[in-house]
Amino acid sequence: MAASCPLPVTPDLPTLRAKLQGLLQFLRDALSISNAHTVDFYTESVWEELVDLPPETVLAALRKSASETEALPSETRPLVEAEWEAGMTDFPKIFCETSQKLVSVEAFALAAKYYSVQNLGICTPFEQLLVALRGNQNQRIGENQKAVEFMNMKKSHEVQAMSELISSIADYYGIKQVIDLGSGKGYLSSFLSLKYGLKVYGIDSSNTNTHGAEERNRKLKKHWKLCHAQSRLDVNGLALKMAKERKVQNKVKNKADTEEVFNNSPTNQEKMPTSAILPDFSGSVISNIRNQMETLHSQPHQEENLCFENSFSLINLLPINAVEPTSSQQIPNRETSEANKERRKMTSKSSESNIYSPLTSFITADSELHDIIKDLEDCLMVGLHTCGDLAPNTLRIFTSNSEIKGVCSVGCCYHLLSEEFENQHKERTQEKWGFPMCHYLKEERWCCGRNARMSACLALERVAAGQGLPTESLFYRAVLQDIIKDCYGITKCDRHVGKIYSKCSSFLDYVRRSLKKLGLDESKLPEKIIMNYYEKYKPRMNELEAFNMLKVVLAPCIETLILLDRLCYLKEQEDIAWSALVKLFDPVKSPRCYAVIALKKQQ
């Protein structure tokens, strides 16, 4: 195990359960907003049923709340938010006791902020965890380096942050094997293998993904080798440049010294040594180059340093053993000593174990890893945006396998989670459910509902950053539903319209295309009738906009419930030494930004 500091203190199980109780109290009234489907917004008179305020009032209050939060300095926000707790139990101020309609948007927004992961005080700072895992080892590399060119900006951001944490945990335990569940295209797996020298098994249920990951990894290895070669050329080129500069400096100094000796004492003139004017390829020069590179990366990139970025970023993206030290003999004559040949041979052998192996398998909570991975050893289990039930099943596999010493799971697609207490009237054969996992929520027989889980996927931070909701497309779909109900007598339709909106030039075009896709006779409706529906509901579009903003504001609370459920489950396990929620990503770049992390007790 690497030298390290004590791991950060995290909330214990009783504290987390107390947080859950307060959250449930709020959600019992608020969940009806999240569970309302925008498709049925006009047909079911959703606004009149759930909100007792004008839409203009709701929008103005939510905008004011968002601007006030944004105006607070980041360092003072936790102090202000800590003062909210005293008023959080006075729910009649938010919802009417008799009608259960929303009556105070301000109180609603305040409660929703309080019950988010970031403000509940249940999140462990990423940097604090890294420092504890690493002890006195190297500090975190900044994200201003370019990652592998095969990833977009979002994926690069996610992979760099998560792989850094995983490698730190691996070093902490002295582990070399990693299992990446739901590995998809293999970005995380490849990066862990190539940059950090870990042996990674990427498991995905899609054979297409597995083959794609293999091909991508092959190209990535080729790219990595080119980076390796280029990085050595960069180092050698800089060494030659520095040597030439020193040669010029020595010539100038030489000339000055010679003139001084000649003028002061002509009889003592001596021939200058040849070493004074030859390039200096001693170890000190190479050391100086390395020091420059380290200094460059230990400081923020200033404008004057930009010219060095491309030269040096390659080396820091390579594994530790990928770049060979450049000796003084290698630069001038390009010859490799026997010792260097032997070292390269050893490096090649060691790198054979640092591989990425994509595998195809459908993983459940009962999957037997020994049947999938023949050389299973002490390892870490990770998952980057594991979909639906795979995220909770990752935690179950972790707790039931002694070889898995740590887990780092970032889930997504909450709408695909199976819920134990949803549709209880239906016959069920499933034994292990995606939600709930912990004892407390099982005892409460808590159910979110699919629409609420779907709304948990909404990205509040992106909306706040100006990436607004697609109100018009939602409006088109809600009006279409009323047309289908009135003109075709259909109240529930199992078929989906899909992403037709982006292909349509107008509302009329949207309705025609949608009816055709749904298998309905669109010739039955003249243009005038269709446009009458549009004109009828257009003045009420702001109701839909305001309602969707309420859902967006509430979304973090439902995500908090799901994440707290998983963390409480881990806290209930006896052999787990440490567990936490950690915000890994920038939520604007990657909305599903929270990792559930747990480490087992050392044997």
From Swiss-Prot:
Name of the molecule in the record:
Probable methyltransferase-like protein 25
UniProt xrefs under InterPro entries = Methyltranfer_dom (IPR025714), METTL25 (IPR052220), SAM-dependent_MTases_sf (IPR029063)
Enzyme Commission no? 2.1.1.-
Q: Which GO terms describe its biological process?
A: methylation
Record key words, sorted:
Methyltransferase, Transferase
Query: Which Pfam families does its entry note?
Result: Methyltransf_32 (PF13679)
* Phylogenetic classification of the source organism: Eukaryota, Metazoa, Chordata, Craniata, Vertebrata
Q: Which gene encodes it?
A: METTL25
- Region feature (Disordered): 326-352
Q: Which organism is this entry from?
A: Homo sapiens (Human)
Role summary: Probable methyltransferase.
The answer to keyword Methyltransferase applying to this record is: yes
